[in-house]
C-alpha cells in the first residue's frame, strides 16, 4: 500500500491528528509504526468503544502494529471497581477483542506498571508537571472532581508513561485524551 493510501486510511473518520506533519514523516521512515489505544476494563466493551476499535482496525489495515492496553491498574486507581471485578472484565475484554478479529497485541497494565523503570518514569513526569496542569488533565478523567483522590491525579502521568514505555508511535484516543497526551 502506498504512503498516500496509508495516510488516507489513518485519517478516515478521525476528528484530530495532533501532529500531522510528524505522522507523515513517521509513515515515510517506519514501515510498521506501533499504534496503541488504552482502555479501562471496568465494564463490558460497548458501542462507544467501537469508534476507537474501528480506528485500530484501520491502522492494522494501513500496516501498523497495534497494541491494546487493558489498563487494570488505571481502573483501580480511578475507583472503577474492585480488583476481582476488574480481573473478570479483563477476561471478558480479551474474548471480545478476539471475537472482533483485531490482531492486536493485548497488554495488561499490571504486567509492567509495577516495574522500577515504569515507576521511575512516572516520578520523573510528576516532577515536571505542575499541580494546575495535573488537575486540568485529571478533570478529563475523574467524574467527581470535588471528591477526587490523589490516585486519580497519578492516572494522567501513567497514561504518558504507558505511551513512552510501550514504544508507541501513534496514540489513539478520544478528544478528552488530547489534554493528557500534551505531556508527551
Predicted regions and their residues:
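NTP-dependent nucleotidyl-transfer catalytic core
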Residues: 1-184
